[in-house]
């Protein structure tokens, strides 16, 4: 996979020091650039909450969220040193760590963000009830640089469907453009993932409500057999307006990744601050309730992929031996 990107001077505010006054004392701040994704999606929502809660909790760090094109831009930006930390969806992370279509990355995991069960949303008054009902129809699969189209590609491949041949695939410039396309009929469905995902919420809050389409139990078994890294996940009842029953789906965990050379002490401070305010982050953003030390250890493909500074903190609190 070849990545083309431009790193502008404005992006290159890396983990460096700045000074601030508090109570008459000069406090040295470490500025940390955080790559998110295009406006209107789940990553900017999470990234802004993450930065706000951590900045409030620790006066010595200043996390600055930046909109990017998403996971597929965040990875090369981290590799080039254009970002300190960035949000990356599970499937691009998996491919990059495993060296699928490229050489393996040397980036590290700061934390698991949240699980991302993938599914489609359609208008409640539409005739579509199953994934195969959507074959041949215009479907918005997410923003061009995001991880969502990768998750959908694996999901559909598991049941013998090709994303760009069996559907009229639509790839968005901005994640926030998808819901309007479903509501006005330009798209039959919108693919997305997660609990509290903005796109699903927007369609569900539309005039006629929404219906969600996920793989059937038989389809889930087929997908798991072909792509075992995808895990069974559940969207609890009531996660979206009008969703009265739990939805079983498949997906993976999104991560906050760090550049390879992020200093150990910076990663340690970030981990200590983050996991000290898990409750505050959860209160700020429901999907961030899954951002815990225990989930990070469980979700990491290999514990050695977790940043050494984070591992030091995890050993101190007993989640890693």
Description of each model-found segment:
Residues 90-92, 100-101, 126-127, 163-262:
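Pocket-lining segment of extracytoplasmic ligand-binding domains
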Residues 113-117, 250-251:
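Short, solvent-exposed loop/turn segments at the edges of secondary structure
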Residues 141-155, 230-299:
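Ligand-binding clefts/hinges and TM-proximal coupling segments of bilobed small-molecule sensing domains
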Residues 1-30:
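Short, low-complexity disordered leader/linker segments with a strong preference
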Residues 21-89:
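N-terminal (or domain-start) structured segment
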Residues 105-114:
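Short beta-strand-centered segments that line the small-molecule binding cleft or hinge
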Residues 177, 184, 194-212, 222-229, ...:
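An extracytoplasmic/periplasmic, membrane-proximal ligand-sensing/linker region
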Residues 31-57, 61, 116-184, 279, ...:
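Bilobed "Venus flytrap"/periplasmic-binding protein-like clamshell domains
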């Amino acid at each position: 996979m070849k990545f083309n990107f431009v790193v502008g001077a404005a992006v290159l505010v890396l983990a460096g020091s700045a000074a601030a006054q508090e109570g008459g004392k000069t406090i040295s701040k470490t500025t940390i650039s955080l790559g998110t994704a295009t406006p209107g999606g789940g990553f900017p929502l999470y990234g802004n909450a993450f930065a706000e809660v951590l900045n409030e909790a620790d006066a010595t760090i200043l996390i600055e969220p930046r909109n990017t094109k998403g996971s597929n831009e965040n990875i090369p930006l981290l590799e080039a040193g254009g970002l300190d930390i960035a949000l990356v969806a599970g499937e691009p992370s998996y491919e990059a760590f495993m060296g699928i279509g490229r050489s393996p990355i040397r980036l590290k995991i700061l934390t698991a963000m949240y699980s991302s069960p993938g599914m489609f949303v359609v208008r409640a008054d539409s005739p579509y009830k199953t994934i195969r009902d959507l074959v041949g129809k215009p479907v918005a699969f997410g923003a061009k640089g995001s991880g969502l189209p990768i998750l959908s590609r694996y999901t559909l491949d598991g049941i013998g469907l090709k994303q760009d041949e069996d559907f009229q695939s639509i790839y968005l410039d901005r994640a926030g453009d998808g819901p309007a396309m479903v509501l006005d009929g330009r798209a039959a469905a919108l693919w997305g993932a997660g609990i509290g995902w903005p796109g699903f919420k927007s369609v569900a809050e539309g005039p006629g409500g929404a219906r969600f389409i996920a793989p059937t139990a038989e389809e889930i078994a087929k997908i798991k057999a072909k792509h075992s890294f995808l895990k069974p996940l559940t969207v609890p009842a009531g996660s979206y307006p009008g969703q009265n029953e739990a939805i079983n789906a498949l997906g993976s965990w999104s991560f906050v990744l760090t550049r390879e050379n992020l200093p150990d002490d910076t990663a340690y401070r970030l981990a200590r601050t983050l996991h000290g305010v898990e409750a505050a982050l959860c209160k700020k953003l429901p999907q961030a309730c899954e951002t815990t030390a225990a989930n990070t250890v469980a979700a990491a493909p290999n514990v050695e992929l977790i940043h050494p500074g984070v591992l030091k903190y995890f050993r101190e609190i007993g989640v890693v031996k």
